[in-house]
Amino acid sequence: MKKVVFFLFSLFFFCYSVYAENFDITGEYVSLYNMNEDILLYSKNDTKKTSIASLTKMMTTLVAIEEIDNLDKIVTIKERDFEGTVGYSKAGFKVGDKVTYRDLLYGIILPSGADAVNAVVNNTLGYDKFIKKMNETAKKIGMNDTSYANPVGKDDENNYSTSNDLAKLLKYALKNETFKTIFTTKNYKTSNGLNLESTVNRYEN
């Protein structure tokens, strides 16, 4: 069997790096790519706009990586980093924790932590400028059916995308070695000893 790499998006999950034979696609919104050959293998409702929830955090992470000069710079977790996080998944950081930006990025991607998102946003561009940068980056990539209204993925009529646009984003982002390393990591221990585990649904062979 020939191994291909693909990414599949439904409402809240994606998977990649599987064999092309005998896969079962049940997602409502799907873009299936062979990344080795840059070929679209299958699509379903791939240009239909939909709420993207935590998939928003892929763009959040990409923008952060492009904006932060030193990922090993120390950041102190503050109370403001937990504002608006009730009901959302968190990485597990606590007020007063001293961690690196790198730790926070793993906290965003692996456990989909809203606390990590807020800490990054608050310590870099600030909320409004960060959202503006997310939308500017989307346009640069060619995500013409995408709009970001927040960096966490909260329900908002102005926070949406398509599986086709998200495929463009992931394809672009994986060219960044830092993003690729974080995105493909399953487990990570932060500099202050917090163990993070990926919640991404994967199919890997």
Language model segments and positions:
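Sec-dependent N-terminal signal peptides of Gram-positive bacterial secreted proteins and lipoproteins
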Residues: 2-20
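Active-site-adjacent loops and short helices of periplasmic peptidoglycan-processing enzymes
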Residues: 20-164, 168-177
